[in-house]
Amino acid sequence: MKTVLITAFEPFEGEAINPSWEAVKVLHQREVGGARVVACRLSCVFDLSLEELYRAIAEWQPEVVIAVGQAGGRTDISVERVAININDARIADNRGNQPIDTPIVEKGPAAYFSTLPVKALVQALRVAGIPASVSQTAGTFVCNHVMYGLLHQLHQQGDVVRGGFVHIPYSPEQAARHPGEPSMPTPLVTAALEVMIKQSLAQQVDVAVTGGALH
């Protein structure tokens, strides 16, 4: 049976929970789309998060890796198109690290594109009635760090395994403490992940539909 690795993060920036992990953990050891799903919680820490990710990849030998992270302020499931080779932390990570303008991989490419069918995932989510869009930036914090590190590692291993990153909004419980911020219920995020797992396994070539942005 094929394996899909789904990662999420521990809470950060004073939050009591991270909705990415709340949504991901319930999928651990479940069968979705004919594949076994394994879940891994990453530290919200530069470098350490990649060490944990690489160990999980080595242990589980997945066919697909989907990394998930919280992005408070996002209004929908944001499927990331690209990761850039820079750390520029507006806040410190969970161990007090705050790198500014440092490369994730010395002499690595400026960017990597997701190897998941990004637009097909968005299309499938919308068909399922779940708000979704293509995102053109994963930021410059630990989420982008993990996405770039993931894609670099998979490229070094011959691009046999496909991977990418997805940002999700606050949970309603978090949004209650951040008045005016959008949110998405955790069960809906979990349902979205199931849709994306199935689509990622079923489709390797992306669809040619618009997903660009003006700014």
From Swiss-Prot:
E.C. designation(s): 3.4.19.3
Key words, A-Z: Cytoplasm, Hydrolase, Protease, Thiol protease
GO MF annotation list: pyroglutamyl-peptidase activity
This protein's GO CC annotations: cytosol
Location of this chain's protein in the cell: Cytoplasm
Catalysis: reaction(s): Release of an N-terminal pyroglutamyl group from a polypeptide, the second amino acid generally not being Pro
Lineage: superkingdom: Bacteria
Keyword set includes Lyase: no
First-tier enzyme category under EC: hydrolase
The keyword Hydrolase is assigned to this record: yes
Active site location: 80, 143, 167
One BP annotation, GO: proteolysis
NCBIfam families in the record: PRK13197.1, pyro_pdase
Family affiliation: Belongs to the peptidase C15 family.
Subunit structure: Homotetramer.
Protein task: Removes 5-oxoproline from various penultimate amino acid residues except L-proline.
Stated name of the protein: Pyrrolidone-carboxylate peptidase
